[in-house]
Amino acid sequence: MLTKPGKKLDSSESTHHTTSSNYPPLDIVHQTPQPRKEMQQKPLFDPKKMDNLIKPEPAGFTNHHRPNPSPKIPSSPGSNMTESQSNLNTKPNNNNSNNNSNMSSRSNSIESTSSNPSKPHTGGDIRWDAVNTLTSKGVQLGISDFRLLKRLGYGDIGSVYLVELRGTITYFAMKVMDKASLASRNKLLRAQTEREILSQLDHPFLPTLYSHFETDKFYCLVMEFCGGGNLYSLRQKQPNKCFTEDAARFFASEVLLALEYLHMLGIVYRDLKPENVLVRDDGHIMLSDFDLSLRCSVSPTLVKSSSVHAAGGGSGSSRPVGLIDEDAAVQGCIQPSTFFPRILQSSKKNRKAKSDFGLFVNGSMPELMAEPTNVKSMSFVGTHEYLAPEIIRGEGHGSAVDWWTFGIFIYELLYGATPFKGQGNRATLHNVIGQALRFPEVPHVSSAARDLIKGLLVKEPQKRIAYKRGATEIKQHPFFEGVNWALIRSATPPHVPEPVDFSCYASKDKESMAAVDGGGKKNNNGAGGGCSTGGGDNKPNGDCNDPDYIDFEYF
């Protein structure tokens, strides 16, 4: 399996890391493609001073949706919340007092936190059924309730394992993060941010957090296991290592809906790349890895009302009926077009606007703005080949960076490479800033696809497609013509992975999976967020061919 180089830089360390939630297919053990690695470092193109160090802030401060950070997760040494918050131009959170009253319902004890909130998209999920069967008996889930089977991947702040809930035949992906390592590298808030974001999500193309708990040494997140690997690994298996345009359109459509939902919640993803797009058992996708995400407040604003509401408007106004002053609105737009796709498309004067649901027969659906573009983060985070120019220049960035990375993402799916990759990482950053976008002659890509990529990869964020109207503007682009957004979950995926055979993990309930006190060697390349593992040739004592054995020394 070919590997793909990449780096994640951090101003506090020189080690290189891979992404933290990369789940390769089960049949890949030691030949998993190495994903490009994110970076978190001072900008190399500071216009005022080249040596200016912009300290990265953890992405998890202002939030109108979730409770305040858990008191059980201590502030890491050297962290400065006030200084980090000063990098964000967001509205103050006025809901903290109300949220704090709900903290008693969330346990951050050493055993477990597990609940099944009302999440429509997880209805009928056998994983929730299995979890609820145990928790309804008063059981607080902990590490002892899971049988660790195999390490799936590792990244900057943790390792991901395939696990089985004991007494059931349900399987999960468990992300394990070492507390001491996170604290020593000032990354506790990153782990906390990911947990709180995952707890908030309810979307068919985003992860479900089934439980989270901590032990004396670890934080653990129990999530959905995706047996199909990731899009980077899948792309490597395609002819010429690139997807057909139909396949790329399918994957891009589902990613777009996930980004739309995140932006509606005030979450800037900041880490889109094929390695972080996992393939579920049914062939649909799931975004992963939210430790670099930025959370901020976002307030929906009515940009265009329906003709029903606009009917009472004054006829003497020169402004189009139902529109507010664009300058008075927050830049960026998110519309409920996931559910009413064709209603929101602009219509000709003589064309009747008709809703599939019988609504607004003589008009159009209202458009809402909920795109967090006004936030200005100074963090230098991401992956070299996917970094937006405004991040490299240190100008501060908002949600427009996700649309830049979306353009790079589509380009890579279609061409099998990223457009600005240079001889090294520094050359790549220079190319992002100064090199014009070019398209290879082969493979052949439609003009509609190239036009969309050009619109997304505009170096000035204010001129970038989707800056004013968010995902809706992208949905209406000719590249996505024919996509039924409301029924995309019913569409046939271009690739459905082979079912995973879990029979080799038939439980014998051996206690040989208990903690191994010694025998592990420190992994000096930063894998697993600094966790020590007994991987490679340095395995602790045990039968490594036994499917019940896992070479992780802490369990």
Curated annotation (Swiss-Prot):
Reaction catalysed by this enzyme:
L-seryl-[protein] + ATP = O-phospho-L-seryl-[protein] + ADP + H(+); L-threonyl-[protein] + ATP = O-phospho-L-threonyl-[protein] + ADP + H(+)
Q: Where is this region: Disordered?
A: 1-126, 514-547
Q: Does the keyword Transmembrane apply?
A: no
Q: Which GO terms describe its cellular component?
A: cytoplasm
| Protein EC | 2.7.11.1
Q: Name one GO molecular function term.
A: protein serine/threonine kinase activity
Entry's Gene Ontology BP terms: pollen tube growth; unidimensional cell growth
One matching Pfam family: Pkinase
Q: Which UniProt keywords apply?
A: ATP-binding, Cytoplasm, Growth regulation, Kinase, Nucleotide-binding, Serine/threonine-protein kinase, Transferase
Q: The AGC-kinase C-terminal domain covers which part of the protein?
A: 481-555
Q: Which residues bind ATP per the record?
A: L152, G153, Y154, G155, D156, I157, G158, S159, V160, K175
Q: What is known about regulation of its activity? A: Activated by PDPK1/PDK1.
- Knockout mutant characteristics: No visible phenotype under normal growth conditions, but pollen of the double mutants agc1.5 and agc1.7 is impaired in polarized growth of pollen tube.
- Where do Gly residues bias regions lie? 526-537
Q: Where is the composition biased (Low complexity)?
A: 84-118
What the entry lists under InterPro entries is as follows: Kinase-like_dom_sf, Prot_kinase_dom, Ser/Thr_kinase_AS
Instruction: Write out the function statement from the record.
Output: Functions redudantly with AGC1-5 as signaling component in the pollen tube. Required for polarized growth of pollen tubes.
Q: How does it assemble?
A: Interacts with PDPK1/PDK1.
The family annotation for this protein states: Belongs to the protein kinase superfamily. AGC Ser/Thr protein kinase family.
Q: What is this protein called?
A: Serine/threonine-protein kinase AGC1-7
